[in-house]
Amino acid sequence: LKNYFKFEKVELINDFAVLIYGIPYLKSNQFKTLQNNTNKNNDFEGYHAIVGAGTGLGISRGIISKTKIFVLPSEGGHIEFAPKTLEEWELKQWLKNYLNIERVSYERVISGEGLSNIAKWKFSKEDIRDHPFKHYLEEAKESNIIKKNLAGKICQLAKEGDPLMAEIEKLWFNAYSSFIGDLAVHELCLGGLWISGGTAPKHFKNFISD
């Protein structure tokens, strides 16, 4: 890259860690506040954490001062999934068998693929023959394009009022919001806890609900 573009210096960094560098440059219309922030002056100084579910589950931390930004990359999305309900425990056991793994990370549940996994689990335990999504699951076995769009289809059907898809989406969101709460306690990020990723705008109303 350095030679091809004739740059003086090239530095490669984690794709999620780079988001920390962008925080000080955000304008007020580029983010929404979910809870009253501790940064009353909007100077963005302090310790920050970013979490985002999308293709995977990304996490990054950083310290922003008046003169410098220190970025602390993380692979926290690979922390082991800790079920908080019987339903989540059953999901975890199913994922172990379905994926043939001993350890289930949060990313297996809280991501686009994770949402699809929850749907597959639901359909494996319930006799639902005529639901349109079941046919979509079958088609996904033969098409990577359809497979990649499973999460989007779930959200679409849930938005259209499908009760089963809404239930699946709610289980996913409950796991995600619980993880975010744990992250806030773990990191004590008084500068700000930021929710990023492709799923954040789609679930904004859920994030601000009681």
Positions of PLM-derived features:
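ATP-binding/phosphotransfer module of carbohydrate and carboxylate kinases, centering on a glycine-rich
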Residues: 90-210
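Phosphate-binding/catalytic loop of phosphoryl-transfer enzymes
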Residues: 2-112, 116-117
